[in-house]
Amino acid sequence: MLELRLVQGSLLKKVLEAIRELVNDANFDCSGTGFSLQAMDSSHVALVALLLRAEGFEHYRCDRNLSMGMNLNNMAKMLRCAGNDDIITIKADDGSDTVTFMFESPKQDKIADFEMKLMDIDSEHLGIPDSEYQAIVRMPSSEFMRICKDLSSIGDTVVISVTKEGVKFSTSGEIGSANIVCRQNQTIDKPEEATIIEMQEPVSLTFALRYMNSFTKASSLSEQVTISLSSELPVVVEYKIAEMGYIRFYLAPKIEDDEEMKP
């Protein structure tokens, strides 16, 4: 038996909006410690990892580990029927091929039940090792979203370069080129507006902007985004979900032509 009650129902709606463009079908894994998802996008370029810890739910019951295959677009349609202030409960019986979403209005004068068929989805769990990164950038998520959106009007890729000067986002396309530099600034009274750069060594990597723009759909979940970069590893774009967990996006860098790689 599975029963999860989330007072901030809007949180689940935001999570779905953040990932459904990248991933069509995915398994939600429930265990005694939390509700999680790990899935590749259809082109196997990006990976999404979500964790909502059990402590963040008002009520969390998971008698045994359960994996529920869901079509995320169908799930998003159901969640759109919930009001932003509604309390959402997810229920599933052991061995059942359906999951029930229950939406309660805050005054509890209206309760709606939606039942959705589960799917059998073959998915392999990738072990994601904890790695040391050459550079870690923390910045306002709204700023990162704006930069990715602005650069998309010029080019298809973004070069993210971290040096002691700051973090630079660059692109070029048929109409020209653009560079946006963010320098470290720590706002004591407004930590959510700070840009903090931890650099072991300079790093410069190229990524597809369409994926970065897709990742920024998670901006509504967190005021800050953390971007972890290393030349040998996929970038990690992480949004913390207040007191509950995180959503992380992993994206392999684009390899430049050999000619361009020569110093």
Swiss-Prot record:
Q: State the GO CC annotations.
A: PCNA complex
Residues spanning the signal sequence: none
Q: Which domain of life is it from?
A: Eukaryota
Q: Which Pfam families match?
A: PCNA_C (PF02747), PCNA_N (PF00705)
Entry keyword Nucleus: yes
GO molecular function list: DNA binding; DNA polymerase processivity factor activity
Which subcellular locations apply to this protein?
Nucleus
The UniProt keywords, alphabetically, are: DNA replication, DNA-binding, Nucleus
Q: What does this chain do?
A: This protein is an auxiliary protein of DNA polymerase delta and is involved in the control of eukaryotic DNA replication by increasing the polymerase's processibility during elongation of the leading strand.
User: By what name is this protein known?
Assistant: Proliferating cell nuclear antigen
What gene is this protein translated from?
Answer: PCNA
